[in-house]
């Protein structure tokens, strides 16, 4: 592993449709635009950023497993898996990599089934309702915490 810190950005189901899917809830910015902006931000902060978006739970879990020993921090928007995936929770626990949970919308102001997260209690923190800015805040926080621990 290089000396450069590595942050992994994970995005769950339907986030590939950002920019066109329910823009009143999720905004008009595409996932590609978000990732491009975060990649520039990561570079300016002196860290490496890698990204995976998948609609398949197993692909996200496999990537989390591969992160062990190679990734210093995870920023994850698990999308609908937030409310359903014990397997995603177990994968994050298994690798012991700190992570921040991000949601574009305020999940607590939405349908009751969205109020529960299987990840929040094991995360470093949760950012929700700040739109695409939440990703930037999560990346900045991850880098700050990594800098303090190294």
UniProtKB/Swiss-Prot annotation:
The active site is at 26 (proton acceptor), 103 (proton donor). Keywords: Amino-acid biosynthesis, Aromatic amino acid biosynthesis, Lyase. One of its GO terms (molecular function) is 3-dehydroquinate dehydratase activity. It catalyses: 3-dehydroquinate = 3-dehydroshikimate + H2O. Pfam families: DHquinase_II. It comes from the Bacteria. Substrate binds at residues 77, 83, 90, 104-105, 114. PROSITE patterns: DEHYDROQUINASE_II. Its EC number is 4.2.1.10. GO terms for biological process: amino acid biosynthetic process; aromatic amino acid family biosynthetic process; chorismate biosynthetic process; quinate catabolic process. The record marks 21 as: Transition state stabilizer. Pathway: Metabolic intermediate biosynthesis; chorismate biosynthesis; chorismate from D-erythrose 4-phosphate and phosphoenolpyruvate: step 3/7. Belongs to the type-II 3-dehydroquinase family. NCBIfam families: aroQ, PRK05395.1-1, PRK05395.1-2, PRK05395.1-3, PRK05395.1-4. PANTHER family: CATABOLIC 3-DEHYDROQUINASE. HAMAP family: AroQ (MF_00169). Homododecamer. Catalyzes a trans-dehydration via an enolate intermediate. This is 3-dehydroquinate dehydratase. It comes from Erwinia tasmaniensis (strain DSM 17950 / CFBP 7177 / CIP 109463 / NCPPB 4357 / Et1/99).
């Amino acid at each position: 592993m290089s000396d450069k810190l590595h942050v992994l950005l994970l995005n769950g189901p339907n986030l590939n449709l950002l920019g066109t899917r329910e823009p009143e809830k999720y905004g008009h910015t595409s996932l590609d635009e978000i990732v491009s902006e975060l990649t520039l931000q990561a570079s300016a902060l002196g860290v490496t950023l890698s990204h995976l978006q998948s609609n398949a739970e197993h692909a996200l879990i496999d990537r989390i497993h591969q992160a062990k020993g190679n990734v210093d921090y995870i920023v994850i928007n698990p999308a609908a898996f937030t409310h359903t995936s014990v397997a995603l929770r177990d994968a994050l626990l298994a690798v012991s990599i700190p992570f921040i949970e991000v949601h574009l919308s305020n999940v607590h102001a939405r349908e009751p089934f969205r109020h529960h997260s299987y990840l929040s209690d094991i995360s470093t923190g949760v950012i929700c309702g700040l739109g695409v800015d939440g990703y930037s805040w999560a990346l900045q926080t991850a880098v700050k915490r990594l800098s303090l621990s190294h």
